[in-house]
Amino acid sequence: VGFKAGVKDYKLTYYTPDYETKDTDILAAFRVTPQPGVPPEEAGAAVAAESSTGTWTTVWTDGLTNLDRYKGRCYHIEPVAGEESQFIAYVAYPLDLFEEGSVTNMFTSIVGNVFGFKALRALRLEDLRIPVAYVKTFQGPPHGIQVERDKLNKYGRPLLGCTIKPKLGLSAKNYGRAVYECLRGGLDFTKDDENVNSQPFMRWRDRFLFCAEALYKAQAETGEIKGHYLNATAGTCEEMLKRAVFARELGVPIVMHDYLTGGFTANTSLAFYCRDNGLLLHIHRAMHAVIDRQKNHGIHFRVLAKALRMSGGDHIHSGTVVGKLEGEREITLGFVDLLRDDFIEKDRSRGIYFTQDWVSLPGVLPVASGGIHVWHMPALTEIFGDDSVLQFGGGTLGHPWGNAPGAVANRVALEACVQARNEGRDLAREGNEIIREACKWSPELAAACEVWKEIKFEF
């Protein structure tokens, strides 16, 4: 008989420490926690096998294909410093294993089945290197950072946003009123909350209409281009596209999607529609913490961020470093660069396991949102730089004098920080002083500073 039946060790076939990675390979870095007694090589090889061509036993149809051409290979294993039984396993996948232009297929292959594998106690995908050949099969963001600035005619500063609260329960007319007040006060964008879709108290079409009215009114009065992220997320792809079409008919500049709950397939369709029809696309990452919060199991957010850049989105929420949600500064800045820059060098101190070349795929603006207020402005300006969107929900609507003064306070604080930075002042050291000086000529800012002077989200 030509083949030997039975179960065999994965490491015989899938652990190849002398393999030279190809420029066309997709490379993955997995944090592997093997079950007690399972050697790291076997665990790493098992990951490579289960996420590519392997199955648990030898099958005779293996003889009909060229395994060496199609198998994933675990080509390097290193222990994790400070962790007893954790290893980083590096796996190389041949490009032919993946459908072109499909983030869905890429994830189904790489993280589809292997996470339930018995030989592993836990598994986390830390990073992916997307080869140039594969990047080129994706459209990516509908427009990207530069085109967005040109469309909005806003340069040399971060953009300001605000999520309309209370997130659920307002009627469409009152919702539109809140949008108008924020935009009129000086924000660039307002935002539908991620769970505002089309509920009994406010159907999507009514909301779209009143928000468009608010936007045009604020635009006429301020002479600035304004936007409201109209959430097109829906229960079916057809309904989602219907909402995007209506937004386009209203002539608004931007729509929004929840890319993880909505799914990569729907998201990529929407991104194509947005590019074809001149709409910007704001992406919210609802559900990400389910996937990325555990340190030893799941997928790191930097991988979800890379996937979004491939699937398509012009903005994506990416933590604040300073607000109420978790995020370590260097690590956050690592994936912020992965979103914005064209070429990112490997840098383990920032969590970047591979050098990534995006070959001019448009960039994505990172959005800082969640528990931030005027006192954070110097830090945010310093950390995120100009190419970002800073979103203050409660930090605008919680202003004691109302929404418009709340918006004024944020805009004044931002302009003061940008001016100070341009004059060469050190925002990290003089931040509080810069905000205090600005308070002198903005009563709105002074009132905001008073309200939030004691708030800290430190746990």
From Swiss-Prot:
Gene3D superfamilies: Ribulose bisphosphate carboxylase, large subunit, C-terminal domain, RuBisCO large subunit, N-terminal domain. One of its GO terms (biological process) is photorespiration. The active site is at K165, H284. Binds 1 Mg(2+) ion per subunit. GO terms for cellular component: chloroplast. Its main location: plastid. Pfam families: RuBisCO_large, RuBisCO_large_N. The lineage of its organism: Eukaryota, Viridiplantae, Streptophyta, Embryophyta, Tracheophyta. It is found in: Plastid, Chloroplast. The gene is rbcL. Substrate binds at N113, T163, K167, R285, H317, S369. Keywords: Calvin cycle, Carbon dioxide fixation, Chloroplast, Disulfide bond, Lyase, Magnesium, Metal-binding, Methylation, Monooxygenase, Oxidoreductase, Photorespiration, Photosynthesis, Plastid. The modification N6-carboxylysine is found at K191. This is Ribulose bisphosphate carboxylase large chain. Belongs to the RuBisCO large chain family. Type I subfamily. Mg(2+) binds at K191, D193, E194.
